[in-house]
Structure formats: structure tokens, C-alpha cells
Amino acid sequence: MSEHIKPSVMKNINAKEMVVLKDQVACLPGQIISKTLAQNDHVSVTLFAFGAGEEIASHRAGGDAFVTALEGKVEITIDDDTFVLEAGNSIVMPLGHPHALKALEDFKMMLVIIYPENPRE
């Protein structure tokens, strides 16, 4: 009797295959490239590649946003605090707090957003 296996919630990436995340997106001058790996009501996993100098203006996320720098260097402002992340560094941008990003050089990151069970929290 075969066991029923549910389909993967991951997309744009092969299952059961080793990958180097920073190689899954390319930095292009004057552009921000994104590649969604998972998206549902509970979590979002996206890879980003920023050309040097590219920015995301201050905004608020609907969940806790966990950034892991994969390559390059970025300046992240959360509320009035500024942090510089390099490859291997991570930071949490808390739910509801304004945050902005500016690539100080070509930069790649993985963004994981965890959404609250009750969006009104």
C-alpha cells in the first residue's frame, strides 16, 4: 500500500537537491530581483538580489521579518536604529516596526516573514 505524500509548499527550487542560495538570484545594476520560494498565510520565504545603491523605502511588514545576508553588504534601518549586515549576518525586523534597506554594494539576502496567527495582533 503506497503512502499519500502531500505536494511540496516550496516552489522555484528543486526538492532533495543541494543548492547554494546566493546562486539562485543574480544582482543586476539598477534592479532589485526577487524569487519566492514559499508563500502562504503563515510564512513567506523570498530571495532578493539588489544592485549596488538600490533601496527599499521605509515600510512595515505584516509579520516578523527575518533577514539573512547571503552576499555583499546592506544598511538596514529599523525604527531609528541603523545596522550594517554582511554575508552570514542576520537580523529580525519586528512586526509593525518601520524598516528600510539600502544595498551598499551588490547584495543578496533571504527574507523569511512569519505572520501572526491573528493578523490583528
Residue map of PLM features:
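A short, N-terminal "cap"/entry segment at the start of jelly-roll beta-barrel domains
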Residues: 1-42
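Ligand-binding loop in jelly-roll beta-barrel domains
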Residues: 95-119
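Short, conserved beta-strand element in jelly-roll/cupin
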Residues: 49-51, 60-76
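Conserved short histidine dyad/triad with adjacent acidic residue
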Residues: 30-31, 41-61
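A cytosolic small-molecule/anion-sensing beta-strand core signal
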Residues: 70-71, 86-87, 105
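Short acidic-glycine-tyrosine-enriched beta hairpin
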Residues: 80-95
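Short beta-strand His + acidic residue motifs that chelate non-heme Fe in jelly-roll/DSBH
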Residues: 56-58, 76-77, 93, 98-104
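Structural motif
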Residues: 73-75, 82, 98, 108
